[in-house]
Amino acid sequence: DFRIHGYITPLAPQKSLRFYLKEKNLLNQLLDVNHNVDKIILRSSYSGWGNEIFVDGFIATICKNLNVDIMSYHPVITYINGEYWGIHGLRERMDLKAISNKYQIKKKKIIDADDKGYSKKNGYGKLNELLKLLKENPNISYQKVAKKFKMKSLIDWLIVELFFQNTDWPCNNTFFWKKKKISQFI
C-alpha cells in the first residue's frame, strides 16, 4: 500500500510517496540499517525541487556519525506502473514505530513530539514549558536545559541546522522523542 506523503509536497509537481511494507526487512541492507523498517518514503524536496534535490540526502550522509537521528538516504529513479515519476530520495519513515524498532524500546514506553510541539501522549507539556521558558528567559542555565534534553544531541542538531543554513527549520521536519521514565528528550 502507498499514499502521497507530507504536508506541503502534495502541492508540488513531484509528489513524495509513503509505502507500507509487508516484508519488514526487505530494504534493511539498502537503507543500511540494523532494524526492521515497516514504512519508507520516496521523498521529493518541495522547497528545493528542481535545483537542490540531493541537498537533504547529502547533509544526512555527512551527519550520520553525529549524535542525531537521521533518515538514511539513497537517490532512486522512480517508475510507478511503467510511468516515470522522477528522482526521489529513498528514506525510512521516522515515527514512533521506527524509533521503537531502531532502539528496541516498546512503542508504548516512548513519548514523541513533533515540530509544532504537539504529542498524542501525556508528558510533552514539560517540554513545552521549557521552550516557553527559553523564549522568555535567554539567560537560562545550561543545567536547566540539560535536564530536559540530551545535550550532545541538541548541540549537534543546532550545529547542523545553523551550519547548513536550513531555511525550513526549526518549524518543520523535526521530531523529538524520549523514554517515558527518562526526563531528557533526544
Task: Give the role of each language-model region.
Residues 1-50:
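Conserved NTP-binding catalytic cores of kinases and kinase-like/nucleotidyltransferase enzymes
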Residues 12-14, 35-37, 71-73, 106, ...:
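Short, solvent-exposed loop/turn segments at the edges of secondary structure
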Residues 19, 82, 168:
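Conserved hydrophobic/aromatic pocket- or pore-lining residues that grip, position, or stack substrates
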Residues 30-34, 42-47, 51, 83, ...:
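ATP-dependent phospho-/nucleotidyl transfer catalytic cores
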Residues 46-68:
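A conserved alpha-helical element in kinase catalytic cores
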Residues 65-79:
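Short, well-structured beta-strand/strand-turn elements
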Residues 87, 173-186:
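Conserved protein kinase catalytic/activation segment
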